[in-house]
């Protein structure tokens, strides 16, 4: 097998992708805890699974190998000590390591098979799953006060964010929100211990222990030499700067990092919710991220005089900055919703800008964003629509739901 991770663009033919099928974690959402768990609504599990299966099969029909996070994680934990270590870390990071409850929960979780263990951790552990006789603390007995020992992880079907493939390596990300912080631990163990990856010594350009957050929805691989990263509600400028320094000092292909500042709000959560690449010279964009004259804050980061310095150049036009770093004389920014103020806001909320390119000029989108899809087709893009009534409730689209592992070079 060649190197197991290889992504040098957003649009190269997709060969291998990582998904997570929605599971019990979705059914453990309740209205009282939606905000805490970063959801706006509760998807209906049978339908969201059906829609996700349709999405996965759509990719397979185009020759894409589909891997599942939950399966890889279970396969990585073959060693008994490794299982115990993983459970300890999950409980600690999930703040379920309070007093004796830690040991009780650990014994409970380790009683399951690997597959069941992973599903249980992802789905959450409720207080009523532990025998009352084993509960020694007041908070354990108060199920109505808070029902979980270990919170569910309903955002896991957005595999884009906890880690991102960059060249032949990846970033394993520190997630900004506590509800998602544990998610990248799965990828850490998969890369270190799954036989598909472990023997290849995959470079980690930035790991989850770095103190400032970065998320994969903000990381876009424009070409072999250039990546774009959103400075957003979820990704900090300090993390981008550290990643740029690490890349410039540890490899020689990526030469520029484009830091793109976007409004810090839930609707514009990551760069890929407002901006994606669909062809060599075509991008989707939500017009609301630009100022009245199309102005934005964009910074081109390049290697400085030594490993700890950067050359930083400020630009105010996204189009001009893209033309500069991609060496293009012309390019097209396709507005989400066709620029209509109502359609644009509605379709961006339902991830009209969150396209997944599976080849140059070929994208997967949600069927509900018909204005944006029509406009993409008018620009010569092949649009493959997938079902979206329940998937879209999590506020993420096809790009959010997929982590490319291998793409062909363009």
Curated annotation (Swiss-Prot):
Record: active site: 400 (amidino-cysteine intermediate)
EC number: 3.5.3.6
Record's GO cellular component terms: cytoplasm
Catalyzed reactions: L-arginine + H2O = L-citrulline + NH4(+)
GO MF annotation terms: arginine deiminase activity
InterPro entries for this protein: Arg_deiminase
Pfam family, one: ADI
Domain of life: Bacteria
Keyword annotations of the record: Arginine metabolism, Cytoplasm, Hydrolase
Listed pathway(s): Amino-acid degradation; L-arginine degradation via ADI pathway; carbamoyl phosphate from L-arginine: step 1/2
Coiled coil: none
Biological process annotations from GO: arginine catabolic process to ornithine; arginine deiminase pathway
Keyword Hydrolase recorded: yes
Subcellular location: Cytoplasm
Keyword Secreted: no
Protein family according to the UniProt entry: Belongs to the arginine deiminase family.
Protein name as annotated: Arginine deiminase
């Amino acid at each position: 097998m060649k190197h197991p991770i290889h992504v040098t663009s957003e649009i190269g033919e997709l060969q291998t992708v990582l998904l997570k099928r929605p599971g019990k974690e979705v059914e453990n959402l309740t209205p009282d805890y939606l905000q805490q768990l970063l959801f706006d609504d509760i998807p209906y599990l049978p339908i969201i699974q059906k829609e996700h299966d349709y999405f996965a099969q759509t990719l397979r029909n185009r020759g894409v190998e589909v891997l599942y996070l939950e399966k890889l994680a279970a396969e990585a934990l073959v060693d008994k000590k490794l299982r115990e270590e993983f459970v300890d870390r999950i409980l600690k990071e999930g703040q379920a390591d309070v007093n004796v409850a830690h040991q009780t929960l650990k014994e409970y979780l380790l009683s399951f098979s690997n597959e069941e263990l992973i599903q249980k951790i992802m789905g959450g552990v409720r207080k009523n799953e532990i025998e009352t006789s084993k509960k020694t603390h007041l908070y354990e007995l108060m199920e109505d006060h808070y029902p979980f020992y270990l919170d569910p992880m309903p955002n896991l079907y957005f595999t884009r964010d906890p880690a991102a493939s960059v060249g032949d390596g990846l970033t394993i990300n520190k997630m900004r929100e506590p509800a998602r912080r544990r998610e990248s631990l799965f990828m850490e163990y998969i890369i270190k211990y799954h036989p598909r990856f472990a023997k290849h010594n995959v470079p980690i350009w930035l790991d989850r222990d770095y103190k400032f957050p970065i998320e994969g929805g903000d990381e876009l691989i424009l070409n072999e030499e250039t990546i774009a990263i959103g400075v957003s509600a979820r990704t900090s400028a300090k993390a981008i700067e550290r990643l740029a320094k690490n890349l410039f000092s540890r490899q020689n292909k990526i030469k520029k990092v484009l830091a793109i500042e976007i409004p810090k709000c839930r609707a514009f959560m990551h760069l890929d919710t407002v901006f994606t690449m669909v062809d060599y010279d075509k991008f989707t964009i939500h017009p609301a991220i630009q100022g009245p004259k199309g102005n934005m804050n964009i910074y081109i980061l390049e290697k400085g005089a030594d490993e700890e310095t950067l050359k930083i150049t400020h630009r105010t036009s996204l189009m001009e900055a893209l033309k500069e770093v991609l060496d293009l004389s012309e390019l097209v920014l396709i507005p989400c919703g066709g620029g209509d103020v109502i359609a644009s806001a509605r379709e961006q909320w339902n991830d009209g800008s969150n396209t997944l390119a599976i080849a140059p000029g070929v994208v997967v989108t949600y069927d509900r964003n018909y204005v944006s899809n029509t406009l993409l087709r008018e620009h010569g893009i092949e649009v493959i629509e997938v079902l979206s009534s329940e998937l879209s409730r999590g506020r993420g689209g096809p790009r959010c739901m997929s982590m490319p592992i291998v793409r062909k070079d363009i």
